[in-house]
Amino acid sequence: MSLPFTVIICIVLLSAILISIVIFGNSPNFRNTPIYKLRLKILRWNHDIIAWINYVDSHVFGNKLVFYSGWLVPLFYIIVVSFCLHQFFTKVYKLLPLFVRKSGFHSTYIAFTILCIFIDTFMATFSNPGKITTGNVDKVDNFFQNNELIFFADNYCSTCEIIKPARSKHCSICNNCIMLFDHHCIWVNNCVGYYNYKWFMGFLIANINLLGYGGYLCYQAMSSTKTEFPTLSYWKTIISTNDSNKATGVLLILCVIFIMIAVLFTGLHLRYLYLGVTTNECDKWSEVEYLISLGSLYQVIDSNLNEKYVEKCVIMNHDNDSYETVFISLKNENVLFSSNDGINLRKIESMEDDLINIYDHGFVDNLKERMFNRVLN
């Protein structure tokens, strides 16, 4: 096996492993495992690198470096896809069996697949995710209700200098508050929010189609050319015959590895749709679940307090060096009252039985809300 081919395979495998750890390492099934800890280290390294880049950018490049560097990943993605397509048409296509090359269906579907990947990438990259401005903030604020558990009334974005509606979040990369914020996608250098979630899902599905159909065509090409080397295994045919077979093998391996990641990631988002949460909200609900596991989350019953839920914690009373049980606000962590104040509380024992996600309207309606949304501004 030649060194370049070895390097390519190692890079592909390492990239797939790292991407999988970052995407799925935060799953409850991986908590307190080496995978979860490695994910934290990767994110910490990423945070330190970004902090260093921001420092250099602000002191040397006048805050322009971060803006332009955000386009490196989308540019890399487009270059890789374009290069792979070039390799396919110059080295793989001629190896395809005649029933594929002479088929009007396959010719049309190849064109359709390429068209979809570039259109969905363009739309996911450049469409408005749902930027909140002074002109539309009132409409957005009235669209989603605060549940006083993960979203709170009268929250204020100090950067945008506007109120922060429920289900929104300020993106430090885009420097905008985004309606129904899901996450910032580095692959398209854009936030995924209320208006462009449909294009993001289209981007994922287009990639699954490209990888799945591309893998099928590469397998057909390998099966066709394998007849010329009956004494060699598929692996030997890939690494020791000619450049066309090597390119076909590399593309097939890429498709097999990355379609699994794309399918799992798309399945994760379908699960979020089923649960009626966004990626951002899933993290918030995880914090709520953690409080429940500690026995620290309580619902306020029959009180004049402007709080629906509070967190129990123990603090030290420095006046007499004793410890005191108090209840703090989930919104700002201010101490609201102590256990001796006689406030009527109900302990939250279970996420499923004691809490209601007011944003979950059922899978079909959740899907309609994200895919067929109405324009507010």
From Swiss-Prot:
Pfam families: DHHC
Species, as recorded: Debaryomyces hansenii (strain ATCC 36239 / CBS 767 / BCRC 21394 / JCM 1990 / NBRC 0083 / IGC 2968) (Yeast)
Bilayer-spanning residue ranges: 5-25, 65-85, 104-124, 199-219, 250-270
Alphabetical list of PROSITE patterns matching this protein: DHHC (PS50216)
Top-level EC class as recorded in UniProt: transferase
Substrates-to-products reaction catalysed: L-cysteinyl-[protein] + hexadecanoyl-CoA = S-hexadecanoyl-L-cysteinyl-[protein] + CoA
Record's GO cellular component terms: endoplasmic reticulum membrane; Golgi apparatus
Top-rank lineage group of the source organism: Eukaryota
Lumenal side: 1-4, 86-103, 220-249
Keyword vocabulary terms for this entry: Acyltransferase, Endoplasmic reticulum, Lipoprotein, Membrane, Palmitate, Transferase, Transmembrane, Transmembrane helix
Similarity comment: Belongs to the DHHC palmitoyltransferase family. SWF1 subfamily.
Stretches of the chain found on the membrane's Cytoplasmic side: 26-64, 125-198, 271-377
This protein's domain notes: The DHHC domain is required for palmitoyltransferase activity.
Source species taxonomy: Eukaryota, Fungi, Dikarya, Ascomycota, Saccharomycotina
Function of the molecule: Palmitoyltransferase that targets several endosomal SNAREs. Palmitoylates the SNAREs at cysteine residues close to the cytoplasmic end of their transmembrane domain. May have a role in the cellular quality control of transmembrane domain-containing proteins.
Gene Ontology MF, one: protein-cysteine S-palmitoyltransferase activity
Domain DHHC: 155-205
One GO term (biological process): protein targeting to membrane
Its EC number(s): 2.3.1.225
UniProt-annotated location(s): Endoplasmic reticulum membrane
Protein name (database record): Palmitoyltransferase SWF1
Record membrane topology: Multi-pass membrane protein
